[in-house]
């Protein structure tokens, strides 16, 4: 676990599109709670998981490396870089679906030794990059992102807020150095938000990450907003 995190502070003279971030030590439990639970509770809440993404990739298809997103005020285009480009300039986009409750398209972006997710507003066409595919909470005002850092054998985690205009703002981002997501190839099935508003994550100690999946000692975390 980490004891402190870094989070963003917006200067008074900064506009909403231009943030300046500063390092400041704050306790993690200022924002979230993390609870180790047993497998029985995890499986029980898995029956109450919330499906908030509409996977409609058959409706929006990539053609010749180009994805076109129809928005009310504009058409938004995402184009992959050519294969003969320098590796450092590599960009590859995949349409994932949409989150109808906050009026966003979702794309996953792959780059040279990096990846993220892109949320595109279906009205304005304005895009916002976030850590990874999000987990929207039932209040529709917050979302978590969690993604494994394979090279560092750690886990990156972030919390975002959503205002009335559906604008996304990052509250904090941190790295957990002692645990990894269990079975990273199936995170879509194993990590979920329940109706009770908590994120449920199977985890393992980082030292077991490269072992065969059957030998990994899986535990379960329940992550929620600080009340």
Model-assigned labels for residue ranges:
Residues 1-109:
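Terminal domain-start segments
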Residues 64, 114-118, 152-161, 200-224:
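Structural motif
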Residues 95-132:
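Acidic/His-rich structured neighborhood in mature extracellular/periplasmic domains
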Residues 96-101, 134-145, 184-186, 190-199:
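Blade-terminus and WD-like Trp-Asp/Gly-His loop motifs, strongest in beta-propeller folds
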Residues 121-124, 162-165, 226:
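Short loop/turn segments that connect beta-strands within beta-propeller blades
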Residues 123-155:
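Mid-length scaffold segments of soluble, non-membrane domains
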Residues 128-135, 167-177, 222:
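Beta-propeller fold detector
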Residues 171-189:
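Conserved blade-ending motifs and adjacent loop-strand segments that build the rim/top face
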């Amino acid at each position: 676990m980490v004891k402190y995190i870094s989070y963003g502070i917006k200067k008074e003279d900064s506009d909403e599109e231009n943030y300046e971030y500063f390092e400041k030590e704050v306790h993690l439990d200022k924002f979230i709670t993390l609870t180790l639970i047993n497998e029985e509770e995890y499986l029980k809440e898995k029956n109450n998981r919330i499906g908030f993404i509409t996977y409609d990739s058959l409706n929006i298809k990539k053609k010749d490396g180009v994805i076109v997103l129809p928005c009310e005020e504009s058409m938004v285009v995402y184009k992959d870089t050519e294969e003969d480009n320098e590796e450092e300039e590599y960009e590859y986009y995949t349409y994932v679906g949409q989150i109808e409750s906050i009026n966003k398209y979702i794309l996953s972006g792959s780059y040279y030794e990096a990846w993220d997710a892109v949320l595109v507003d279906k009205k304005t066409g304005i895009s916002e990059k976030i850590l990874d595919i999000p987990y929207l909470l039932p209040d529709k005002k917050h979302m978590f992102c969690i993604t494994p850092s394979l090279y560092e054998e750690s886990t990156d985690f972030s919390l975002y807020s959503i205002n009335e205009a559906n604008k996304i703002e990052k509250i904090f981002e941190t790295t957990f150095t002692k645990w990894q997501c269990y079975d990273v190839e199936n995170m879509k099935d194993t990590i979920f938000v329940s109706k009770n508003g908590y994120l449920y994550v199977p985890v393992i100690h980082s030292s077991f990450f490269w072992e065969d999946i059957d030998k990994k000692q899986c535990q379960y975390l329940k992550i929620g907003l600080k009340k």
